[in-house]
Structure formats: structure tokens, C-alpha cells
Curated annotation (Swiss-Prot):
Organism: Deinococcus deserti (strain DSM 17065 / CIP 109153 / LMG 22923 / VCD115)
Gene Ontology BP terms: glycogen biosynthetic process
Keywords: Glycogen biosynthesis, Glycosyltransferase, Transferase
Enzyme Commission identifier(s): 2.4.1.21
Top enzyme class: transferase
Lineage: Bacteria, Thermotogati, Deinococcota, Deinococci, Deinococcales
Family: Belongs to the glycosyltransferase 1 family. Bacterial/plant glycogen synthase subfamily.
Key word Zinc-finger present: no
UniProt-recorded name of the protein: Glycogen synthase
Amino acid sequence: MRVLHVTSEVFPFSRSGGLGDVLGALPAVQATLGAQVSVLSPWYGSLAGAPEQIWAGDVADVGPVRVGELRQDGVRFLFLGLPEFEREGLYHPDDVWRFCTYGRAVLPVLRALNEVPDVLHGHDWQAGLVVAHAHEAGWRTVYTVHNLQYQGRWNLAEASGWSGLGPAWLTHEGAEFYGDLNLMKAGLIAANHVTTVSPQYAREITTQQYGEGLQGVLLRLTLEGRLSGIINGLDQERWNPRTDPDVPAYSDLAGKAAATQALRTEFGLDKAPVLGVVSRLADQKGMDLLIEALPRLVHNWNVVVLGGGDPLLTAALEGWAQHPRVSFAQGMNEALAHQIYAGSDAFAMPSRFEPCGLSQMIAMRYGTLPVVRETGGLVDTVPPDVGFRFQPATPEALVEACQQARAAFEDQSDWEARVARAMALDFSWDGPAREYLALYERVVTG
């Protein structure tokens, strides 16, 4: 089985979030299971790594293109070099135009390299146009929605010329969406099968509450048997309390005490249990709910937050950091993130929606019990006998769940049992990788 993943980012070469993490882990596991796997992403000016150039030429209606290659963990990584991507950073305000250019270039380049896969697997809106052109060429395709909120939209009158799509695609039955070209919609309607990153999120996005305007398309896909959810896995080597160089090594609750003490020392915390947060500061992540809940949380918890994003949420947390039981580190710091996952007793994720979420899985692997809102992948991954779940997206519901966690913390046998169950959960990529390979087989033979 020859599989080609098409993505806008892939760890460790280019990463801004969870998409890059997924593409940095899933392909390698698929390769160990016998698939011949390649990953195609842009050759950014800020790319971490030095690909060997293996092809260069002019592509009709695109211009000069070059292709670089790196091999790692049994996977072939291909990097598509276009002038539009030679600037610093990954994402910019003109990304719809940039990824339209990318989308027009991919198939001609793959043909020039004689790289026609059995299955092309596109990820998120940046690959939507690639999936549409692959469909036009008769290729078999899978398309994964990692976050439906980001759809790649631009005024149709302007963007239609960028896409290279024929007139039928530029209608309401095609990729038109309220006067815009919608690249995610193009991928959804073109793919042989669509997945998203948890079974619960696959159900949620067919509703008006979570469908971001595309619920009609997604409901039709569900009724046709073309939409399903496959939970993301976790990089077991990168996130392993037994071997993590950033924390004292441990494999059980007794060993975890050293990591907790190290975190207390780092932030000058008192003896109250520690509620950790590692998150983008955004309303989607429920960080406004956390801030509103802080006046009550500090009665029972030390709260340690690592994250960056919304300026208003950042300013609010900076103000709260004057409180002796609230600590805030702005930005993203990989080593500190590991220390918070390991050293916290509980971990808060009050997300309004969460397609899959990795943080709750990391926390449980480190024996830190999640307090989560019942949405998306948080429902699929946090068992009620391990973590603490709440439904309404309100500060009051978050506080109540944290009170339940504190009560469990005071019951030593209950807490120890929950931690043991958390650390025994299997969040490896092996299961999801096998599910994707089985899906590819169905797509190819169907």
C-alpha cells in the first residue's frame, strides 16, 4: 500500500500545533505496519532541516517549483518548494492564495516524480484543493478534518482563478460557500472518505452547534457512510514519564511525587494540590471560563498556566499571577510543558469544542487526572473512572468538576486507583494507524 499524506506542517520540520504532531507520528507507525509512506508538505523558508533537492522545473500555471527529500523513521518526507513559501513562519494572511498555488502544483509534480500513490490522504483545509484535483484525476483519496473551524475561505470572484477548478466546482453544489471559495468544502465533497479525529467529534459536526455551516454536507456524508472518526494517538517516546529528560523519571504515583515537588519549587507553590493548564489562550479552549472560575478555584488549588494567544486573556492571567496560588508562564516552552504535565495533580481542559485533544492524553500518561468538558475527543478518551467531566460551558460547572477532583484527591485510595488506571491507558498510534490502513484498503477496493 503506497500512501501519500499531504499536509501544511509536519513535526519536527514544521509545526504550529496538533496537526504537525499527528503527521510527525502517524506515518512512521504506518510504515512499521508495512505501508510505503510518504509525507508532502511545503518547503518553508523557516523549515527545520536541510532536504536534498531531487527535482526542479516549471509547472504550467504555477511557475518554478523544486522538491526536496528527507528520510526518517522509514518515511519519505517530500518538501514542495514554491516562491510563495520562502518567507519566515508557516501561516500568513494570504494563505488561501498560497495554498491554492500549492494545490495546483502537487499533482503535476507527483506525476513528474512518478509518485502516484494508492491513496492520497489530505489533512485540513490547506490540502482540500489537492484532494479535489486528485479526485478529478481519478485518484483514491481520504480527507481528514482536524479542526472544522478553519476552512480556507476567500471571495469566490477572486479565488476561483487561483484554484484551477472547473465551473462545476464553483457552484453551491461544489466548493462555493456563501459567496466564497471554501477549500475545506472542496476536500469534503471530493474525498472518497472523510475522517475526523474522534468518533464523538464526527457526530458533533453534523449538528448546527458544531458544524460551522457545513453540517448539511457532513450529514450527507454520514448518511452515505463516508464520514467516520478515528481518535488520534500519542507519540509514546516523546511523552514518557519513564524516560522524559525534563522531569524526574517515574512510573507510578509514588515516583510522581518528585515531579510534583520540583514544580512546587519552580513556582513557589504551597501544599495545596496543583491544577495544571497547558493551552492556547482562546475562547475555544475555554480559557475565559477558567479565568472566571479562578476566584473559587484558588480556595482548593494551586493553578499553573502555560500558554499564549488572546491578548485579553493573557492580560487577565498576568493580573491573576500576582495571587500566591496562581502562576502564569506566557508563550510555549516545551520543557516547562513536560514539567506541568508531570508535576500537576490534575489538568484542566474546559474546551468549548475539542476535535480530539492531545493534552488530556499526555496528562493521563503522566498520572495527572484531567478535568474536562464533555465534548469531542475528550468524551472518547477520558473515562469517568479516571478523570472528571462536566457538560455546560460555564465557570460554575468547571468549579464543580474541580471540587469533585479535590474530593477524590482527599480519598487516597480513590485517587491512587484513578492514577493507576490513567497510566495504564493505551494511547499509542498503533490502533489508529491500523484503522487508517484498513480504511485505505476499503477506499482502494471500494
